[in-house]
Amino acid sequence: MNLQDIAKIREVNPVVVNYANFVTPFLVANGLNAVGASPIMSDEVSEAEELVQLASAVVINAGASRKESWPLMNKLCEAANQYQKPLVLDPVAVGATQYRKALNLMLLEKYHFDVIRGNIGEIAVLAGIDWQTRGIDAGNGTGDMSAVVQACAQKFKNVVIASGEVDYISDGQQVITVHNNTKLLPAIVGSGDLLSSIVGAFSAVAENTLDAAVTASLVLSCAGERAAAQLDQQNRPGSFLSYLLDELANITPEQVQDLMKIGEA
């Protein structure tokens, strides 16, 4: 991990193309802008290849996709692989319906995703491991989270992030844990979507994908902790969101270094 990538993003301003979940584009766009990236979103298939060519990374959020949108998703993924741009998948609620499961497995079969970011329930579904999921929530599974994440990374030969109270991140060999957190982050609908897109931004500047995933996790969670501290940990999610964007825009490598709590599972 190289925390100087926090400053590098602000210098490079990588363009991140997002196939966005219609629930959260405001948060994702503003969060990406805050960390120093340049977000762009589109629902037009005819411009997909051109957008990917100018992009530094592509993020696919499968949370609210209609079959009519499959050609656009396919074109974005195809172009990302063709032009060797980092490609991130957020398989929102993949275990909730057969439709969502089929869509995500189709994408993973046809294209190589450098990173998959989901909650532990979503990651377990993709890995083929039983877990009690509940909609977009992780559910109450009792398995070994590090083993689930590692198995998924090995299956798809990429980096996998299971975000939650503790973030588990694996490249199939090692499992890194990030223990920074605040109860206010999950109170913001789309905080996971934002993390997926921030991973895309760091993938554009980091030396390797695992470093990008760990740094992105640390940046969002440490910014969240700093934002919550300004509210004295009160349950004020609306105010927290404003402070979170401020912290994402101003957090420094040194501040993350001082706050970070990482380990290996």
UniProtKB/Swiss-Prot annotation:
Keywords: ATP-binding, Kinase, Magnesium, Metal-binding, Nucleotide-binding, Thiamine biosynthesis, Transferase
Top class in the EC scheme: transferase
Cofactors that this protein relies on: Mg(2+)
One Pfam assignment: HK
Pathway: Cofactor biosynthesis; thiamine diphosphate biosynthesis; 4-methyl-5-(2-phosphoethyl)-thiazole from 5-(2-hydroxyethyl)-4-methylthiazole: step 1/1
Single annotated GO MF: ATP-dependent NAD(P)H-hydrate dehydratase activity
Entry binding sites for ATP: R117, S163
EC number: 2.7.1.50
Binding sites annotated in the UniProt record for substrate: M41, G190
Catalysed reactions, semicolon-separated: 5-(2-hydroxyethyl)-4-methylthiazole + ATP = 4-methyl-5-(2-phosphooxyethyl)-thiazole + ADP + H(+)
An example Gene Ontology biological process: thiamine biosynthetic process
Free-text function comment from the UniProt entry: Catalyzes the phosphorylation of the hydroxyl group of 4-methyl-5-beta-hydroxyethylthiazole (THZ).
Protein family (similarity comment): Belongs to the Thz kinase family.
HAMAP family per UniProt: Thz_kinase (MF_00228)
Record's protein name: Hydroxyethylthiazole kinase
Gene: thiM
